[in-house]
């Protein structure tokens, strides 16, 4: 009897432990179209809070442009509220170039195609809920 208990314990000790509390994560695919050129690359970020929007991304990526389009795939994102932004970094200096007045020289965009008005787009206009895998289209 002791042998059987030891064998069963040995078998179960090699099995992965799950507590039923694992969070499900999702994939967010962002497809950008309407870019002016294939020059440079796209700097994209996912933000999970209004505080730090456009400054401190939750997840980020850099992708190449093909046929004036780009696709960014963000994996392993928890369910919740997010916003996406990107810039078309034409000269690959990894920042948004602006003129003397602070107006962007390079194209940019946000989720929900949120627009800027006398300043950057607002988190409130760009936010969306993620509760399943999602594909988002952003057109310039």
List each model region and its residues.
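Extracellular beta-sheet/turn segments enriched in Thr/Pro/Gly and aliphatic residues
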Residues: 105-140
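Acidic, glycine-anchored loop motifs typical of Ca2+
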Residues: 90-97
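Short, ordered, surface-exposed loop/turn motifs in non-cytosolic proteins
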Residues: 37-45, 50-52
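A short, amphipathic beta-strand motif
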Residues: 26-34
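Bacterial Sec-dependent N-terminal signal peptides
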Residues: 1-25
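Surface-exposed loops/turns
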Residues: 37, 78-79
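A short tyrosine-centered beta-strand micro-motif
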Residues: 82-86
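Exposed aromatic-hydrophobic patches
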Residues: 70-76
